[in-house]
Amino acid sequence: MIETRAVNHEYLGYSCQNTDNNIDFPPAPSSSYRINCLSITLGKGIKLYKIASTILQEFKMTNALGWIEVHIPSHTTSTSSKPIPINHSSLCTLANVFGIAWVLNPCRIISARFDTTTNTSTSTTTTTTAHTTSTTTSHIKSKHTATESTPKQRLISQISFTTVKGHLLTGEERFRIIYDINNDNVIFDMYSFSKPSNVLGWIALPYVRYVQGTFFREQAGAMRRLIERKEEGL
């Protein structure tokens, strides 16, 4: 049973820390881990947020890619025959490698929450801020000469899961749909930290890094297409 497998790293829950505050993309827990992150604006409105949250809950944006599948073995509800993610439930990814083999990697969900309201404070500065973001790293540098706290309300749907024994990698991955109540924006963000967990993982590392370089961008594109189809009634 995947639920009973031990987590294969010492940073359990790290991807969920500070996510209700300003640290949306935490730095790597140690220098040996690599960070991947991407954030895109999907549009505006609570209706869009609901559509995107449903897509996230069923991992449709991942399963739509064709070369990777997410499987949640159990936990259906009376209102849906489809498995839904809940805390501490098992999750497996099945990925096609080079078009010739499928690799199964076990995980465990550590955070599954939907439509959670958060209230935080943000700091507004009077100086310029340099902000660079890529699919692999996010860095923010600024000089604070004067700050002013303003309320920030957000509605969040989030799924975060950790690797367990038997996975090629060690680390965590997190997906969120965020509705900013203040400006009506809907954000889709993705974050992970990882490194190889065993010899096979190190051998496969060049391919894994190549895939990680495009994985979030592909899911962002799939999310947009699925939303468009839903809005068109297809």
Language model region names:
Residues G99-I181:
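Hydrophobic-ligand binding "helix-grip"
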Residues T41-G43, I178-D180, F193-K195:
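Solvent-exposed residues in well-ordered beta-strands and their adjoining turns
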Residues T163-H167, M190-V199:
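Short, solvent-exposed aromatic-acidic interface loops
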Residues S160, N185-D189:
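General beta-strand recognition
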